[in-house]
């Protein structure tokens, strides 16, 4: 697995007369089993960059490669990319919507066209890995604590078996103990799943202890 960004630019409002250059000439390579910290102040373009990496935004200029393929090539499957490059947005608990925890986690892998057996197995395993017990599978995700909701949201992305997991400010709004628990969880996922992780934060202290390199 590798993601390569070559001379990537992104501008908002192109052609409106109010164009804003969010990213300029970004060159980046992410290899197998890397833990990368993406650190910067608010408005520095961190969220824009990770949406480009997941295919939610299209670069104004430049090229992005995933496993050697140009993601903007007509033959490339963006659906496949979004399964392999998992993106957990900031405050992901606000995006929970299903009637039960297990149904919420199963939603993503079902949309990838997997068999019911695969969907159920991967969803149960993902929930187990983030510390959500079987006693919570059938309850409404809205009845969970804030920390549990966030874990369920992360499980929903993990259930799609991503090779690259990107998290946008996953410690936002958590108290010190919650922040440490989240970082410990991410470190565990990194080792057990042998995936690459991009951890977005404005706080250097959050990432310095765990990241292999910081951007």
Predicted regions mapped to residue ranges:
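Conserved ABC ATPase signature
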Residues: 140-144, 148
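Catalytic Walker B motif of ABC-type/P-loop ATPase nucleotide-binding domains
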Residues: 165-168
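Helix-to-loop junction immediately C-terminal to a conserved catalytic motif
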Residues: 54
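The feature captures the beta-strand-to-loop junction immediately N-terminal to the Walker
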Residues: 39-41
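Conserved ABC ATPase "signature" region
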Residues: 117-135
């Amino acid at each position: 697995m590798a993601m390569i960004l070559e001379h990537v630019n992104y501008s908002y409002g192109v052609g409106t007369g109010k164009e804003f250059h969010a990213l300029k000439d970004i060159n980046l390579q992410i290899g197998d089993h890397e833990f990368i910290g993406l650190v910067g102040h608010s408005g520095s373009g961190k969220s824009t960059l990770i949406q480009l990496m997941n295919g939610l935004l299209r670069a104004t200029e430049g090229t992005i490669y995933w496993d050697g393929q140009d993601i903007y090539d007509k033959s490339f499957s963006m659906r496949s990319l979004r399964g392999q490059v998992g993106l957990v947005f900031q405050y992901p608990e606000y995006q929970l919507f299903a009637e039960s925890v297990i149904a919420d986690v199963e939603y993503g892998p079902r949309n990838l066209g997997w068999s019911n057996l695969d969907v159920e197995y991967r969803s149960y395993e993902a929930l187990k890995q983030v510390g959500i017990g079987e006693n919570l599978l059938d309850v409404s995700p809205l009845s969970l604590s804030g920390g549990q909701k966030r874990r369920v949201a992360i499980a929903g992305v993990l259930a799609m078996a991503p090779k690259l997991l990107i998290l946008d400010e996953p410690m936002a709004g958590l108290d010190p103990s919650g922040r440490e628990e989240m970082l410990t969880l991410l470190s565990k996922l990194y080792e057990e799943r042998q995936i690459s992780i991009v951890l977005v934060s404005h706080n250097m202290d959050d990432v310095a202890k765990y990241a292999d390199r910081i951007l």
